[in-house]
């Protein structure tokens, strides 16, 4: 965890990996509070209490930093989805599987609503070969849920093929609108969120087999 004592450390007091983690954590917090456009390498050096040279040892340029902060943002998303999933019954029934599917979809939308600045950066750069896969992975959570629905007979083999793209697109699109404040007040957004999630079920013909 990044603490005030960590922020006061000199360059030499950081282990190589520790400084990189501290920089990404500081960048993540900065973006969440102030937005993507204010993120900068020199500003990050000031916040973490190290020299600009130390920052450049880890991030060659601003785009490199943004890529790492984007990955960290996606991990926040994955954790939100996993936390929501863990609050739902683990019953191996069709209703349980549908509830879990709705839980991760709802958490994805909540990420856009509650952490709009992180949503903005999360998917702007995610194809760098230097990055390890995110953990937990929001994509893996989606695929696991869809496969479970298919195994329980709630989702047909035919629809399973297109389900990932359709489900992701619908939820991601609404989350993006919510992140921009384009879905009305909190009550209107919540109502629309429920409609979108039910629309995903209908579009994919996901049914409770009882």
Predicted regions and their residues:
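N-terminal intrinsically disordered/low-complexity leader segments
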Residues: 1-18, 88, 208-210
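Generic hydrophobic, amphipathic alpha-helix propensity
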Residues: 19-28, 44, 69-73, 77, ...
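Helix-turn-helix
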Residues: 22, 26, 30-64, 68
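Alpha-helical DNA-contacting segments of helix-turn-helix folds
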Residues: 31, 66-73, 80, 122, ...
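Hydrophobic alpha-helical connector segments
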Residues: 82-115, 167
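An amphipathic alpha-helix signature
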Residues: 98, 102, 106, 139, ...
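Short secondary-structure transition hinges
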Residues: 110-144, 183-186, 190
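Hydrophobic/aromatic-rich alpha-helical bundle segments in the mid-to-C-terminal region
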Residues: 131-132, 136, 149-199, 208-210
């Amino acid at each position: 965890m990044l603490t005030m004592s960590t922020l006061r450390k000199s360059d030499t007091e950081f282990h190589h990996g520790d400084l990189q983690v501290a920089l990404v954590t500081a960048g993540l917090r900065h973006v969440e509070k102030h937005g993507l456009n204010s993120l900068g390498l020199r500003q990050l050096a000031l916040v973490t209490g190290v020299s600009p040279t130390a920052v450049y040892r880890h991030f060659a340029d601003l785009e490199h930093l943004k890529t790492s902060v984007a990955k960290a943002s996606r991990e926040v998303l994955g954790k939100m989805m996993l936390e929501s999933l863990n609050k739902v019954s683990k019953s191996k029934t069709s209703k349980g599987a549908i509830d879990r599917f709705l839980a991760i979809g709802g958490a994805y939308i909540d990420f856009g609503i509650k952490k709009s600045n992180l949503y903005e950066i999360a998917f702007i750069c995610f194809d760098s070969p230097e990055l390890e896969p995110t953990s937990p992975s929001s994509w893996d959570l989606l695929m696991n849920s869809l496969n479970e629905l298919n195994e329980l007979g709630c989702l047909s083999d035919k629809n399973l093929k297109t389900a990932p793209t359709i489900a992701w697109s619908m939820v991601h699109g609404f989350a993006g609108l919510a992140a921009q404040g384009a879905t009305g007040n909190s009550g209107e957004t919540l109502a629309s969120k429920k409609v979108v999630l039910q629309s995903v079920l209908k579009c994919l013909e996901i049914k409770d087999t009882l």
